[in-house]
Amino acid sequence: MKVQSSVKKRCEHCKIIKRKGRVYVICKVNPKHNQKQG
């Protein structure tokens, strides 16, 4: 999972999720796209 200051969807399968005040991008099809805002 990459930690980035600005997270964006990288494909149509990516989902933006907020958990505990953090923003995550979760992608089941391509796990390389997983990101966390930090």
Curated annotation (Swiss-Prot):
It comes from the Bacteria. Transmembrane segments: none annotated. InterPro entries: Ribosomal_bL36 (IPR000473), Ribosomal_bL36_sp (IPR035977). GO terms for molecular function: structural constituent of ribosome. The keyword Ribosomal protein applies. One of its GO terms (biological process) is translation. PROSITE patterns: RIBOSOMAL_L36. GO terms for cellular component: cytoplasm; ribonucleoprotein complex; ribosome. The keyword Ribonucleoprotein applies. It holds the Pfam family Ribosomal_L36. Keywords: Ribonucleoprotein, Ribosomal protein. Belongs to the bacterial ribosomal protein bL36 family. PANTHER family: 50S RIBOSOMAL PROTEIN L36, CHLOROPLASTIC, LARGE RIBOSOMAL SUBUNIT PROTEIN BL36C. HAMAP family: Ribosomal_bL36 (MF_00251). This is Large ribosomal subunit protein bL36. It comes from Thermosipho melanesiensis (strain DSM 12029 / CIP 104789 / BI429). The gene is rpmJ.
